[in-house]
Amino acid sequence: MTLTNYVQEVSLADFGKPFHHKAYWNKRLKTTGGRFFPKDGHLDFNPRMLEEHGELIFRKIVRHELCHYHLYFEGRGYHHKDRDFKDLLAQVNGLRYVPTSSKSKTNHHYSCQTCGQVYQRKRRINLAKYVCGNCHGKLMEKNQS
């Protein structure tokens, strides 16, 4: 079954309305489960949400995007802030927020040589340029494990 067929099935089963456009996987999505494009009506979905959280959570993400889709084409409020959107999302039991990833987001660990303050960062920092925020001591990179 293709992604578009799956979205069509969810739309008919949960909303009672057809889905007339295309649905695509988008590997570039990092922090969101999916996106709706009002200009041409297609939906993008993050494949990692299905891999990491399973079909039950992914179906709720599809419901969320279909709420945007159906409300837009009905001419009603389709933004997150709109009451129509919140009501329809609650009615179909969709997710309001995407679950956080189970993977650790901190890759680099630093500690102050003077006071021992520990810092965790996603990106590397220039140890010659930055110092401890507490005591202005020198930072050193800890071994990653």
UniProtKB/Swiss-Prot annotation:
Q: What is an annotated GO biological process for this record, any one?
A: response to stress
Query: What species is this protein from?
Result: Streptococcus pyogenes serotype M3 (strain ATCC BAA-595 / MGAS315)
- Broad class of the protein's primary localization: cytoplasm
Residue span, SprT-like domain: 4-140
In terms of NCBIfam families, this protein maps to: PRK04351.1 (NF003339)
Q: Which family does it belong to?
A: Belongs to the SprT family.
Q: Give the residues the record marks as binding Zn(2+).
A: 64, 68
Cofactor(s) needed, names only, are: Zn(2+)
Q: Would you tell me the Gene Ontology cellular component terms?
A: cytoplasm
This entry's comment on the bound cofactor is: Binds 1 zinc ion.
Query: Which is a Pfam family this sequence falls into?
Result: SprT-like
HAMAP family per the UniProt record, alphabetical: SprT_like
Q: Where is the active site?
A: 65
Q: Return one GO MF term.
A: zinc ion binding
Protein name as it appears in the record: Protein SprT-like
Q: Which UniProt keywords apply?
A: Cytoplasm, Metal-binding, Zinc
Enumerate the InterPro entries for this protein.
Answer: SprT-like_domain, Uncharacterised_SprT-like
Q: Give the subcellular location.
A: Cytoplasm
